[in-house]
A protein has these predicted regions:
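Zinc-dependent metallohydrolase catalytic domains
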Residues: 1-149
Length: 149
């Protein structure tokens, strides 16, 4: 009511969250957006966490909504594949190198390409949907994937 906030996390909760978040900072900070420029994992952390959490929750909602009335294969894609393709299609686009450089230095959102190629490799259901294996370019070993919640 009065805008008063109280910290309900324990010190251990905060420490664990910081450690788990650092996995995402490091992952995104190692993405080469241009040959001479890496993404800024610190700058984009909040939005990357939001994308990750949103994907996890929306996928659970999708599975819940379709459990009693399963969807079939359409155009050769399973419902689970279509879920992830729909997410990816939102971020499709072309962008000039100058704008990549500008946004990477100033925007707290990852570039569209990395909101897909950086987010999906941390979602176990994406691996299952597409049968992603170690030989696939976006594969991230399970122990290196972000697990926040």
């Amino acid at each position: 009511k009065d805008g008063n906030f109280s910290n309900w996390w324990t010190a251990k909760d905060a420490e664990d969250f910081k450690a788990r978040s650092q996995v995402m900072v490091d992952f995104f900070g190692n993405i080469s957006v241009l040959p001479d420029l890496k993404a800024n994992g610190e700058l984009t952390l909040g939005e990357n966490l939001a994308d990750h959490g949103g994907l996890m929750v929306s996928y659970q909602a999708f599975k819940n909504a379709t459990k009693n009335a399963p969807l079939g294969v359409a155009d050769g894609f399973t419902p689970e594949q279509r879920f992830f393709l729909a997410y990816a299609s939102v971020w499709a686009g072309n962008i000039r190198d100058e704008e990549i450089r500008n946004l990477t230095k100033s925007d707290p959102h990852s570039l569209g390409r990395w909101r897909v190629n950086g987010a999906l490799p941390h979602i176990d259901a994406w691996y299952e949907a597409f049968g992603i294996t170690e030989s696939d370019p976006l594969f991230v070993p399970k122990e290196k994937r972000v697990t926040i919640w």
